[in-house]
UniProtKB/Swiss-Prot annotation:
Entry's EC annotation: 2.5.1.141
Organism expressing this protein natively: Prochlorococcus marinus (strain MIT 9303)
Taxonomic lineage of the native organism: Bacteria, Bacillati, Cyanobacteriota, Cyanophyceae, Synechococcales
Name recorded for this polypeptide: Protoheme IX farnesyltransferase
Cellular compartment(s): Cell inner membrane
InterPro entries: Protohaem_IX_farnesylTrfase, UbiA_prenyltransferase, UbiA_prenylTrfase_CS, UbiA_sf
MF GO annotations: protoheme IX farnesyltransferase activity
UniProt-listed Pfam families: UbiA (PF01040)
Entries under CDD domains matching the protein: PT_UbiA_Cox10
The gene coding this protein: ctaB
Length: 333
């Protein structure tokens, strides 16, 4: 018999306080399995990839097709993930109420929905964008379902390090949509998302390690414990901050404004990483870092878009001109 009393986790918080409750956020079964909460950030990094390209801004129709196709591909990946993990979800208290393990939706209906979304995404991207963007979107879908979900997640604590490639593909899609190819700037944002992902996900895994342990999923906090996990979070957090600075050169214009606006984002990220390092078992700090890491990546993508505005280019020209005047007059000496 399952107790109706909320389970208490580390720090005296209930699971419902750590992870949003499905009872509070009611979604239709067909929408729930598409994991809509994950899609906005994927689309934001797609926009970031576009903003890094010479083809920015995109025509309205191509922009809409790129984002629509990306959302459909992400939804299909989410559904296929739920189908693959329905037995696992049924054994975890946090996920047992999801549409498939609870019986609110049949696997057949879910699979039909996933295939429909995949075909619609491919059609929209091929017809409204280009074949490269379509191919990269499908590669991201397959990477998430096959590489991460089926192969890496149940086998290695480094699953999210390697499997993070799936979440890092949207910037490549954006770059391909904007210019028809993926340049070095697109690969820079791909690498940044790859480095950001482990720290982001391990902060959440610290909160849910009891669930993962119960079903035998070898997440890093389960295998190595919170202290080692927090050290790894610190390494990836610092790597993310260092690589993020290269956006100054990755942007075709507006890089100086990006660099200045980036400083508070990186300072806050490092502060939260340091705070968690001082108390690896602290639930509030892990939860705070997880939430901030989401805001951080949204912020990076917003900065990339803002830095492509005409006023950002003007700011760069005036700033560099001022710096050159100061250098020539010896004011730096």
């Amino acid at each position: 018999m399952v107790s109706s009393t909320p389970e208490m986790l580390q720090g005296g918080l209930t699971r419902e306080q750590i992870v949003p409750s499905r009872k509070r956020i009611k979604l239709p079964a067909w929408l729930e399995i598409a994991k809509p909460r994950l899609i906005p950030l994927l689309l934001a990094t797609t926009l970031g990839g576009m903003a890094l390209s010479e083809g920015w801004p995109l025509p309205s129709l191509r922009l809409a097709c790129t984002l629509g196709g990306g959302a459909l591909a992400a939804a299909a990946a989410g559904v296929l993930n739920c189908i693959w993990e329905q037995d696992l979800d049924g054994r975890m208290q946090r996920t047992s109420g999801r549409a498939l393990p609870s019986g609110r939706l049949s696997p057949t209906a879910a699979f039909i929905g996933a295939i429909s979304c995949t075909l619609a995404a491919a059609a929209l991207l091929v017809s409204g964008v280009n074949c490269l963007a379509a191919g990269l979107s499908l590669l991201g879908l397959c990477s998430y379902v096959l590489l991460y979900t089926a192969i890496l997640k149940p086998r290695t604590p480094q699953n999210i390090v390697i499997g993070g490639v799936a979440g890092a593909i949207p910037p490549l899609v954006g770059a391909a949509a904007a210019s028809g190819h993926v340049g070095l700037s697109g690969w820079w944002l791909f690498a940044l998302v790859m480095l950001w992902t482990p720290a982001h996900f391990w902060a959440l895994a610290l909160l849910l390690r009891d669930d993962y342990r119960a079903v035998g999923i070898p997440m890093l906090p389960v295998v190595k414990g919170p202290v080692v996990t927090v050290r790894a979070i610190s390494r990836y957090g610092w790597a993310t901050v260092l690589l993020s600075g290269f956006g100054v050169w990755a942007l075709p214009e507006g890089g100086l404004l990006y660099g200045l606006l980036l400083i508070p984002f990186n300072a806050r990220l490092l502060q939260m990483v340091h705070q968690l390092g001082a108390a690896p078992e602290n639930v509030d700090r892990a939860k705070g870092l997880f939430r901030w890491s989401i805001f951080y990546m949204f912020g990076i993508c917003l900065l990339l878009v803002v830095s492509r505005l005409p006023m950002a280019a003007n700011f760069d020209l005036q700033a560099w001109s001022l710096l050159q005047q100061m250098a020539s007059s010896g004011q730096f000496i």
